[in-house]
């Protein structure tokens, strides 16, 4: 007696092994799963592969997502502890690493997470030599540099999530002060995703109206409205969320999905992501920091030439020097 499938379906062609938009996510902690869920829920990719060393948790997360396939437009979701499962990925997102502790600087994580990447990056590139790497593991700027060194890929195809989230936090806080939607608030945080990040106060605007034209001391210590507190809130916000709930997840997951969308959909959107900044704004260090970049199917194809004030340039160069000093102590 023929199997039901054979009686039901008459095959006329082979099923293609991949959609061509496969995304692999390495690390199924809070950030990895928030990224996976955001990518699936927003239909950024129909093919997601999860990679982790914890087999039981991996299987549980896989089943939990698969059981919701009916509500996610029928994606193909797989999972494995074997990197071979990541083969032919268009985009590899790395969230694996030691979690940041309450009050711990992202930079203090650096060597522990560097050691973890040594076992991840070469394997991803082995199975997907044409992939784009999107680094999310902290400290993300250093980890993006490490991933580039370990991968052998061109710099445009090794990207860090960088200050995309910081800029989103900045715009949200602006929106709360002004009563305007965050998407209508235009402001950028550049440099390090962390304590030495740089708010570009000179460019903050609503509908093209620069706030510094209304208040020339916006963002300075002399400003009676204390707008400079917004940047401090941006820097402190991750620490505050970690203190309250133990980790950050949803915002960084949504940020990651947004970057994945720009790459997979070839949109040439501009986002603040970590990229090589050697030669930008007078930086003479080979480091990765965030600047507004054009993102598409070839990764970072352009860096926006932001017009910065001398103070902002100085702060950005200081951020680069901090990264360079940390990199000098890395052991590969």
From Swiss-Prot:
Keywords carried by this UniProt record: Cytoplasm, NAD, Oxidoreductase
Protein family according to the UniProt entry: Belongs to the LDH/MDH superfamily. LDH family.
PANTHER family, sorted: L-2-HYDROXYCARBOXYLATE DEHYDROGENASE (NAD(P)(+)), L-LACTATE DEHYDROGENASE
Binding, NAD(+): 29-57, 99, 138
GO biological process, one term: pyruvate biosynthetic process
GO cellular component entries: cytosol; mitochondrion
Domain of life: Eukaryota
Main location: cytoplasm
Binding partners and assembly: Homotetramer.
Cited CDD domains: LDH_1 (cd05293)
Phylogenetic placement of the source organism: Eukaryota, Metazoa, Ecdysozoa, Arthropoda, Hexapoda
Single Gene Ontology MF annotation: L-lactate dehydrogenase activity
First-tier enzyme category under EC: oxidoreductase
Recorded metabolic or biological pathway in which this protein acts: Fermentation; pyruvate fermentation to lactate; (S)-lactate from pyruvate: step 1/1
Record EC number: 1.1.1.27
InterPro entries named among the record's database cross-references: L-lactate/malate_DH (IPR001557), L-lactate_DH (IPR011304), L-lactate_DH_AS (IPR018177), Lactate/malate_DH_C (IPR022383), Lactate/malate_DH_N (IPR001236), Lactate_DH/Glyco_Ohase_4_C (IPR015955), NAD(P)-bd_dom_sf (IPR036291)
Protein species of origin: Drosophila melanogaster
Location(s) in or outside the cell: Cytoplasm
Cystine residue pairs: none
Protein name per the record: L-lactate dehydrogenase
Catalytic reaction equation(s): (S)-lactate + NAD(+) = pyruvate + NADH + H(+)
Binding site for substrate: 106, 138, 169, 248
Any Pfam family the entry gives: Ldh_1_N
């Amino acid at each position: 007696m023929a199997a039901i499938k054979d009686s039901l379906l008459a095959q006329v062609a082979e099923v293609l092994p991949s959609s061509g938009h496969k995304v692999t996510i390495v690390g199924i902690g809070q950030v990895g799963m928030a990224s996976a869920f955001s990518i699936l829920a927003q239909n950024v990719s129909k093919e997601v592969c999860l990679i982790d060393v914890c087999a039981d948790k991996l299987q549980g997360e896989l089943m939990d997502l698969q059981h919701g396939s009916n509500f996610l437009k029928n994606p193909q979701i797989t999972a494995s502890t074997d990197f071979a499962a990541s083969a032919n990925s268009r985009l590899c997102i790395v969230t694996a690493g030691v979690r940041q502790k309450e009050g711990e600087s992202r930079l203090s994580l650096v060597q522990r997470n560097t050691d973890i990447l040594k076992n991840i990056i070469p394997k991803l590139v082995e199975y997907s030599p044409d992939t784009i790497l999107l680094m999310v593991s902290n400290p993300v700027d250093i980890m993006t540099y490490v991933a580039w060194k370990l991968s052998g890929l061109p710099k445009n195809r090794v990207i860090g999530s960088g200050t995309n989230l910081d800029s989103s936090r900045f715009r949200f806080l602006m929106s709360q002060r002004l009563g305007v939607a965050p998407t209508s608030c235009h402001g950028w945080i550049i440099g390090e995703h962390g304590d030495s990040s740089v708010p570009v106060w000179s460019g903050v605007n609503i509908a093209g109206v620069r706030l510094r034209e209304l208040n020339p001391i916006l963002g300075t210590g002399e400003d009676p409205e204390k707008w400079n507190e917004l940047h401090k809130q941006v820097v402190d916000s991750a620490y505050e969320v970690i203190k309250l709930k133990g980790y950050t997840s949803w915002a960084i997951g949504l940020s990651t999905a947004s970057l994945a969308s720009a790459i997979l959909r070839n949109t040439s959107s501009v986002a603040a992501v970590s990229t090589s900044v050697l030669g930008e704004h007078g930086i003479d260090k080979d480091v990765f920091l965030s600047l507004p970049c054009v993102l598409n199917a070839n990764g970072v194809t352009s860096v926006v030439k932001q017009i910065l004030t001398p103070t902002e340039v100085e702060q950005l160069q200081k951020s680069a020097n901090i990264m360079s000093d940390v990199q000098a102590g890395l052991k590969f």
